[in-house]
């Protein structure tokens, strides 16, 4: 595992800083078979971090497309609940398909929403700074946990 950008740059460590909350305490190491480990912050902790810093903020998700076997969801992050649609600080889409997996296969809509939310929060600075310097991020990691 390479050096964390969070540890290498004081500016990155100060991004969205909340006194008394250290996101690294909630991060975990994950890896796919045959790949190097990466540090990852689950979406539930990204949401917690966002709520601690922005108690009047909001996260809005919209179903863009939904069929029997596929869902596309958009998520937008706002610093204040009164912000207009175009004033989001993070925005992302995610697509998921129904699978044969007995635990998560039918939860493709929920997984798409979680992925879109995680990516939108990362876009707003809640999680991306934990990426290892020089490593590519796997977009499917937003579903972990």
Summary of predicted features, one role per range:
Residues 1-145:
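Polyanion-binding surfaces on beta-sheet-dominated domains and ring/shell assemblies
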């Amino acid at each position: 595992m390479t050096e964390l950008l969070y540890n290498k740059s004081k500016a990155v460590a100060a991004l969205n800083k909340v006194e008394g909350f250290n996101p690294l305490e909630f991060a975990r190491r994950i890896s796919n078979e045959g790949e190097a480990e990466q540090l990852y912050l689950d979406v539930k902790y990204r949401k917690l971090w966002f709520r601690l810093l922005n108690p009047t903020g909001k996260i809005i998700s919209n179903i863009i497309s939904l069929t029997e076997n596929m869902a596309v969801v958009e998520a937008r992050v706002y610093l204040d609940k009164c912000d207009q649609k175009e004033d989001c600080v993070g925005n992302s889409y995610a697509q998921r398909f129904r699978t044969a997996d007995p635990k998560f296969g039918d939860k493709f809509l929920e997984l798409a929403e979680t992925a879109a939310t995680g990516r939108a929060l990362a876009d707003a600075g809640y999680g991306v700074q934990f990426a290892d310097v020089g490593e590519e991020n796997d977009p499917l990691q937003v579903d972990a946990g």
